[in-house]
């Protein structure tokens, strides 16, 4: 009891707080400085290699490079990030870790009003900073998920920071941060809209808090209108990116994969029902062989133009099932785009746009006329949602949450070496990224060799992973118990609205972790079929950590509230 009482009374002095934050941040960067890049130029043409090539093009003043079927195929903010790191001579892996540390600091600062003691803010920051998923092997790839979780945290930090301070006239900076996060998250990944439910609900909470202020109606409405600052910054980010695409390729779009005409064409093709009744697998076949044949027989001009490639065995290798010739959902859109490229429709962005517009109109007309057996109109590249997926998705989703909470598959090093020609493939990547590749192998094996010093750093990170794997589950359970226990205290009439907003924010983080896990579970069950993969779930880990830490550390009782100490 004596030690507990002393702990309650003790807190960091401002100087020692910042020194301690600097020390643990420097230690994290030091440990991760021993990590090495994992480069596979020939094995990831749609992922790592694409982003790297785009980054090189940006540094040459050529934006995303010469136009073809891949140029605007993905949301490519990560390529710009790589180019900026190159210009600043910052090693790729260190840059990613620094960005993640900054996002951890912003989320910690966001919750400062309910974490008035510096020691509690320090614990939250440290817990987020040493998240094992942030140093997992997938982060060693040259791919956008290296920074995606950090960008997501900026969104959560920005809107949470504003909601907890919306009665303060100087809180608009948090809305700007939220807008930057929203913009970069969406520009980084096509599924970046997943953060919007949290933002919209949080905006509603902010409006509720502002409505309860003792101010004139006009002043309340002015403050509520400030919420559009985030939307404005978000729109500015997207407009700037689309403007660059307009300048170089003549199309004002973020991507021609997520554009309306490609979604319409893909959706039209997935309307066809021929052969679907024979497919008993959960992995969807968007357009079966019978469906393709039906389009050929119906004399679909624009789809038949792709037949020489879609039905070619060599072309199908890597896209279709070698035994059945069926294109699964996770690869059909890439096969469709590549076949259109071979057919000459990707000479310019405008020609590609016209082709997919014509393809959508033609296929929809055939379906609507009854010439082809088809379902209702749709415009999307996402798999169809049907009742048969409910149980498999729930099963995979809840397993994914357990997978994340127990920090599975988060070793800080790759189990294999980089694959590529050292002189003309790997070396240029090392020079551009200022990060060495793990090319050395143990004698007589294909296993990577790491020096004793590297292994010492890895063992420290592995030990930290074991601590998280044991404690996070317990911390989450305890946090949930405390959150439900304090409901009468938080939600009584005279309690501060800041406490209510913080309580909702923590529950919202848990809800968003569940949402992300279920989203990825659906894609895994219906489209990919590659098994639970930590990279796609890496945005879940920091949300669980933050919810557990804030749920346990936050001051919920009104009489305990002290003036917040800002970071």
Where are these regions (language model features)?
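Transmembrane-helix motifs of polytopic, lipid-linked glycan transferases
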Residues: 92-117, 121, 150, 154, ...
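Transmembrane signal-anchor helices characteristic of membrane glycosylation enzymes that use polyprenol
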Residues: 13-44, 131, 233-244, 513-517
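Membrane-interface alpha helices of multi-pass inner-membrane proteins
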Residues: 174-189, 234-236, 241
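Start-transfer (signal-anchor) and selected internal transmembrane alpha helices
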Residues: 1-33, 222-226, 491-505, 560-567
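Aromatic- and kink-enriched transmembrane "portal" helix at the membrane-lumen/periplasm boundary
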Residues: 76-79, 83, 89-93, 127-151, ...
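Membrane-interface anchor segments at the N-terminal boundary of transmembrane helices
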Residues: 87-96, 145, 355-510
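Juxtamembrane membrane-water interface segments immediately following transmembrane helices
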Residues: 41-46, 50-51, 234-387
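Extracytoplasmic catalytic/substrate-binding loops of multi-pass membrane glycan-assembly enzymes
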Residues: 36-54, 63-81, 87
């Amino acid at each position: 009891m004596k030690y507990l009482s002393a702990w309650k009374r003790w807190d960091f002095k401002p100087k020692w707080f910042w020194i301690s934050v600097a020390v643990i941040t420097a230690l994290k960067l030091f440990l991760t400085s021993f990590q090495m890049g994992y480069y596979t130029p020939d094995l990831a043409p749609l992922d790592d290699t694409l982003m790297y090539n785009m980054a090189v093009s940006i540094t040459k003043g050529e934006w995303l490079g010469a136009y073809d079927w891949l140029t605007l195929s993905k949301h490519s903010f990560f390529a710009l990030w790589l180019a900026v790191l190159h210009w600043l001579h910052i090693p790729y892996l260190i840059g990613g870790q620094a960005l993640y540390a900054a996002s951890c600091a912003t989320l910690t600062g966001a919750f400062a009003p309910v974490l008035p003691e510096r020691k509690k803010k320090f614990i939250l920051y440290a817990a987020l900073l040493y998240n094992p998923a942030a140093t997992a092997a997938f982060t060693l790839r040259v791919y956008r998920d290296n920074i995606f979780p950090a960008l997501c945290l900026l969104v959560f930090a920005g809107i949470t920071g504003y909601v907890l301070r919306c009665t303060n006239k100087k809180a608009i900076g948090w809305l700007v941060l939220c807008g930057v996060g929203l913009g970069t998250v969406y520009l980084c990944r096509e599924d970046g809209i997943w953060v919007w439910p949290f933002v919209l609900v949080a905006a509603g909470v902010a409006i509720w808090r502002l409505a309860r202020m003792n101010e004139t109606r006009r002043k309340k409405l002015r403050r509520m209108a400030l919420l559009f600052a985030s939307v404005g910054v978000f729109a500015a980010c997207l407009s700037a990116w689309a403007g660059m695409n307009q300048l170089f390729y003549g199309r004002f779009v973020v991507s021609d994969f997520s554009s309306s005409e490609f979604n319409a064409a893909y959706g039209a093709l997935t309307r066809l029902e021929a052969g679907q009744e024979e497919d008993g697998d959960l992995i969807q076949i968007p357009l079966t062989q019978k469906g393709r044949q039906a389009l050929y027989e119906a004399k679909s001009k624009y789809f038949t133009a792709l037949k020489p490639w879609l039905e070619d065995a060599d072309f199908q290798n890597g896209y279709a099932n070698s035994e059945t010739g069926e294109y699964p959902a996770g690869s059909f859109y890439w096969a469709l785009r590549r076949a259109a490229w071979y057919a000459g429709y990707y000479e310019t962005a405008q020609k590609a746009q016209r082709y997919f517009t014509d393809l959508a109109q033609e296929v929809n007309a055939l379906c609507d006329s009854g010439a082809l057996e088809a379902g209702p109109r749709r415009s999307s590249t996402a798999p169809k949602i049907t009742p048969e997926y409910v149980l498999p998705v729930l099963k995979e989703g809840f397993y994914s949450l357990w997978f994340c909470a127990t920090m599975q598959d988060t070793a800080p090093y790759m189990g294999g070496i980089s694959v590529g020609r050292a002189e003309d493939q790997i070396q240029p990547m090392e020079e551009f990224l200022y990060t060495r590749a793990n090319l050395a192998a143990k004698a007589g094996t294909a296993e990577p060799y790491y020096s004793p010093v590297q292994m010492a750093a890895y063992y420290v990170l592995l030990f930290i992973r074991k601590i998280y794997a044991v404690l996070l589950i317990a911390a989450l359970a305890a946090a949930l118990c405390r959150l439900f226990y304090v409901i009468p205290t938080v939600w009584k009439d005279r309690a501060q609205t800041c406490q209510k907003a913080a309580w909702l924010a923590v529950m919202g983080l848990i809800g968003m972790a569940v949402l992300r896990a279920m989203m990825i579970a659906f894609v895994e069950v219906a489209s990919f079929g590659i098994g639970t993969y930590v990279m796609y779930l890496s945005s879940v880990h920091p949300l669980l950590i933050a919810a557990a830490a804030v749920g346990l550390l936050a001051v919920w009782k009104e009489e305990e509230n002290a003036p917040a100490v800002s970071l």
